[in-house]
Amino acid sequence: MTKNNSLDFIQANSPVRMGIDVGSTTVKVVVLDDDDSIIYSEYERHRADIRSTIILVVTHALDKIQQVKGESQTLSIKVTGSGGLAVSQWLSVPFIQE
């Protein structure tokens, strides 16, 4: 597992965006601030258990965002990758074709 935890630099009320990339072997999550700077990222091999891996990495990202920005936070989420279409339907979030 690899993480980039630089959420200390974001302001309390700035919106954040999360991208989830579901590939053939890994799930990656990245969180961007309103200046398009990466403020959190993580990737994890899913070993064919995509749902559990998504829950894990997204929970890590949401926990970190909540620690820094509090519970009232504007967050948009989009999904991409070879396994992204099914995941976007499961999560009811937009799919972005790579």
Task: Name these PLM-found stretches.
Residues D8-A12, V22-G23, K69-S72, S88:
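Solvent-exposed alpha-helices and their adjacent loops that cap or buttress functional pockets
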Residues E42-H46, I65-E98:
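Short beta-strand-loop/turn "lid" adjacent to the catalytic site in phosphate-handling enzymes
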Residues M1-F9:
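Flexible inter-domain linker/hinge segments
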Residues S14, G19-L56, H60:
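Short glycine-rich, Thr/Ser-proximal phosphate-binding strand/loop in the N-terminal lobe
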Residues N13-P15, T25-V27, S72-T74, S92-V93:
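Short coil/turn connectors at secondary-structure junctions
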